[in-house]
């Protein structure tokens, strides 16, 4: 079994390419995962699709075959040629795939180092795949340790001491190009985490914030939580020509702001499109200053400089965690564990046989017979247990079983995973 990761991110792919590769809804994601797992060499898969990356993480029996299948599937859907995809993609296998996963979970591979959104996005991607039957034991093991590694990085470094995200960087960019945000009308389109962060940053800067969404009650809920106002989505065509500031981050698969609704204005407009695929599609002009996620690189570079020391320390933690993960995997082999159980049982029988002979309870001439009989008794007793252990070794509950047995036979096994819902993910993201 191998781990494989194929990554398209802000590091190797333009926004245009990432748009074509993106998966914006559950239906499309489920279809992708189903096609991935239909490959003869792929047995589990997770799809991560955000504004800055689209990645396939899978377990497979053959790396070359799985890689070919993934590129063919992505090319057929996106319209991007296989040659271009192969030229852009970062491909990681086995230990490098785990190292990359840990880096992503710890936000070391993010455009904004230390940003807090990627952990939640990764958690959601894993939960969706797991709940729909596209991943199980092998990827759950890796995800469990990825979130455990992210917790170590968060606790041992300062890269997340001042939480940032693409949304907060976008608001910082706005404040750098607009002298004063206070009192200015700002429209936030969408109600996801990025929209919520944007609205809160704008409000804290004194902007007059309105929130709109296709589902009005969701906009009302977010506006109530933030202290913002609500704009009916039906009035979007008017708002784009009235608001000086606009941020959009929806999950729409098509642009929601196009040339047809944009009219000339006598004031400058500052628009931030943080969606992938993009929400705004228009021809330049009309005093509109449009920024997309890839335009925020300068601020991101400053962020990287500020967090450089913490990032170096984090890379060390990730390296050690990768080694520890594979060491842990090696302990999960069921056969050495069964062998050790038998050896401990036979040794206990031998010691006890010698004790009763030494005390004269049994004549010494019967020593061989007693030894053989005790071994036969133990073999009969342990046979059913060892058979059950072998039968569940490939099931999703295997790690719980092996960890518990390791604990009982006095191995150093401090981390006993409770289940494959990956409690580390929930604990880290929800702060429990």
Swiss-Prot record:
Further facts:
During catalysis, the active site Cys acts as a nucleophile attacking the alpha-carbonyl group of tRNA-bound glutamate with the formation of a thioester intermediate between enzyme and glutamate, and the concomitant release of tRNA(Glu). The thioester intermediate is finally reduced by direct hydride transfer from NADPH, to form the product GSA.
What Gene Ontology molecular function terms does this protein carry? glutamyl-tRNA reductase activity; NADP binding
EC top class named in words: oxidoreductase
Subunit structure as annotated in this protein's UniProt entry: Homodimer.
Give the site residues for Important for activity: 100
Q: Name one Pfam family in it.
A: GlutR_N
Which PROSITE patterns does the UniProt record give? GLUTR
Q: Which family does it belong to?
A: Belongs to the glutamyl-tRNA reductase family.
Sites where the protein binds NADP(+): 190-195
- Name it: Glutamyl-tRNA reductase
Task: Please tell me the species this chain comes from.
Answer: Sulfurimonas denitrificans (strain ATCC 33889 / DSM 1251) (Thiomicrospira denitrificans (strain ATCC 33889 / DSM 1251))
Presence of the UniProt keyword Protein transport in the record: no
Name of encoding gene? hemA
């Amino acid at each position: 079994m191998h781990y494989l990761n194929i990554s398209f991110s802000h590091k190797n792919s333009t926004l245009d390419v990432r748009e074509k590769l993106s998966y914006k809804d559950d239906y499309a994601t489920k279809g992708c995962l189903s096609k991935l797992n239909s490959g003869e060499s792929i047995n589990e898969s997770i799809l991560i699709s955000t504004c800055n990356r689209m990645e396939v993480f899978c377990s497979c029996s053959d790396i070359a075959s799985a890689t070919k299948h993934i590129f063919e599937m992505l090319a057929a859907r996106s319209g991007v040629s296989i040659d271009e995809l192969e030229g852009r993609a970062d491909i990681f296998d086995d230990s490098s795939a785990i190292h990359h996963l840990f880096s992503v979970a710890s936000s070391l591979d993010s455009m904004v180092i230390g940003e807090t959104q990627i952990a939640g996005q990764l958690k959601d991607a894993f939960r969706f795949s797991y709940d729909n039957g596209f991943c199980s034991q092998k990827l759950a093991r890796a995800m469990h340790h990825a979130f455990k590694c992210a917790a170590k990085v968060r606790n041992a470094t300062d890269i997340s001491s001042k939480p940032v995200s693409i949304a907060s960087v976008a608001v910082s960019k706005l404040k750098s190009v607009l002298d004063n945000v206070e009192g200015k009308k700002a429209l936030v389109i969408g109600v996801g985490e990025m929209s919520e962060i944007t609205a809160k940053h704008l409000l804290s800067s004194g902007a007059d914030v309105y929130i709109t969404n296709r589902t009005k009650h969701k906009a009302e809920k977010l506006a109530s939580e933030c202290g913002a106002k609500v704009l009916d989505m039906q009035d979007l065509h008017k708002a784009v020509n009235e608001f000086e500031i606009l941020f959009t981050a929806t999950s729409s698969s098509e642009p929601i702001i196009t040339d047809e609704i944009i009219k000339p204005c006598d004031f400058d407009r500052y628009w931030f499109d943080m969606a992938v695929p993009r929400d705004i599609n228009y021809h330049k002009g009309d005093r509109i200053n449009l920024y997309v996620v890839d335009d925020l690189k300068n601020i991101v570079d400053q962020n990287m400089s500020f967090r450089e020391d913490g990032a170096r320390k984090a890379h060390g933690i990730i390296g050690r965690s990768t080694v520890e993960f594979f060491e842990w995997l090696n302990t999960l082999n069921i056969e050495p564990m069964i062998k050790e159980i038998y050896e401990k049982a036979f040794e206990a029988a031998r010691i006890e046989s010698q004790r009763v002979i030494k005390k004269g309870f049994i004549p010494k001439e019967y020593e061989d017979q007693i030894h053989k009989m005790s071994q036969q008794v133990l073999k009969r007793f342990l046979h059913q247990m060892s058979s059950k252990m072998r039968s569940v070794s490939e099931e999703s509950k295997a790690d719980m079983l092996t960890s518990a047995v390791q604990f009982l036979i006095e191995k150093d096994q401090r981390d006993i995973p409770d289940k494959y819902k990956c409690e580390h993910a929930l604990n880290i993201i929800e702060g429990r």
